[in-house]
């Protein structure tokens, strides 16, 4: 895996910003520091790659604010042996962070352009335990199996039972829930046998999750 080579002052400020905002998990901080965010943003935005802000990418999507990436990752309580499903690959940045903390990442992206670019970028940077699939995040194939952890990186209006059923007992799902132009809340769901225990975490703002596959974009 390629590690970040950001100039020391930028990297130090990046880490300090995350710590000041409450990120304390050492493994998460190390993963955030190691992944070269500047390699996942468009060239025109690379000067701002290490700032704590979301940035636009292709297909009207965004690469999430680093604090949000770190916070969601921390809330997943990841372990090295976990198998994780990500819905919404985007640039591939969050998948790269997650890949340093778990055994396998399966990431589903509905936009062909984003899926192809993320797959190529992750391969170039040697993130070998990430599989990027072109697909509909609302219709994960049964053959995908089940997962220890699930993360959704676009806002859904609700969580479907088929998605919850992909979570192994003892597993955790993190997702932003709410309308595209209204209040959204980051939700953590823990599966206890056949019960799904929900907890509201923080208010957030994400692009909306869309159904279908955009093969022409």
UniProtKB/Swiss-Prot annotation:
Reaction(s) catalysed (UniProt annotation): [protein]-L-isoaspartate + S-adenosyl-L-methionine = [protein]-L-isoaspartate alpha-methyl ester + S-adenosyl-L-homocysteine
Subcellular location: Cytoplasm
Gene Ontology CC: cytoplasm
Keywords: Cytoplasm, Methyltransferase, S-adenosyl-L-methionine, Transferase
Main location: cytoplasm
Keyword hit for Transferase: yes
Annotated catalytic residues: 64
The protein's enzyme class: transferase
Single biological process term from Gene Ontology: protein repair
Superkingdom of this protein's organism: Bacteria
GO terms for MF: protein-L-isoaspartate (D-aspartate) O-methyltransferase activity
EC number of the protein: 2.1.1.77
SUPFAM superfamilies: S-adenosyl-L-methionine-dependent methyltransferases
Entry-linked Pfam families: PCMT
Entries under InterPro entries matching the protein: PCMT, SAM-dependent_MTases_sf
Family that this chain belongs to: Belongs to the methyltransferase superfamily. L-isoaspartyl/D-aspartyl protein methyltransferase family.
Summary of the function given for this chain in its UniProt record: Catalyzes the methyl esterification of L-isoaspartyl residues in peptides and proteins that result from spontaneous decomposition of normal L-aspartyl and L-asparaginyl residues. It plays a role in the repair and/or degradation of damaged proteins.
Protein name, as recorded: Protein-L-isoaspartate O-methyltransferase
């Amino acid at each position: 895996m390629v590690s970040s080579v950001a100039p020391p002052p930028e990297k130090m400020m990046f880490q300090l910003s995350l710590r000041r905002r409450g990120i304390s998990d050492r493994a998460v901080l190390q993963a955030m520091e190691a992944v070269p965010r500047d390699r996942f943003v468009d060239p025109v935005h690379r000067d701002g790659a290490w700032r704590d802000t979301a940035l636009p990418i292709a297909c009207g999507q965004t690469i999430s604010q680093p604090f949000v990436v770190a916070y969601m990752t921390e809330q997943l309580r990841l372990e090295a042996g976990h198998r994780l499903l990500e819905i919404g690959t985007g640039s591939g940045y969050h998948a790269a962070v997650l890949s340093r903390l778990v055994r396998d990442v399966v990431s589903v992206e509905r936009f062909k352009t984003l899926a192809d670019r993320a797959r190529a970028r992750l391969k170039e940077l040697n993130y070998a335990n990430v599989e990027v699939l072109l697909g509909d995040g609302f219709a994960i194939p049964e053959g995908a199996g089940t997962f220890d952890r699930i993360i959704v990186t676009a806002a859904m209006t609700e969580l479907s039972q088929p998605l919850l059923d992909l979570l192994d007992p003892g597993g955790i799902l993190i997702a932003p829930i709410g309308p595209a132009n209204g209040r959204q809340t980051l939700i953590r769901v823990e599966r206890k046998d056949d019960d799904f225990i929900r907890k509201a975490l923080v208010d957030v703002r994400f692009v909306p999750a869309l159904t279908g596959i955009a093969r022409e974009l």
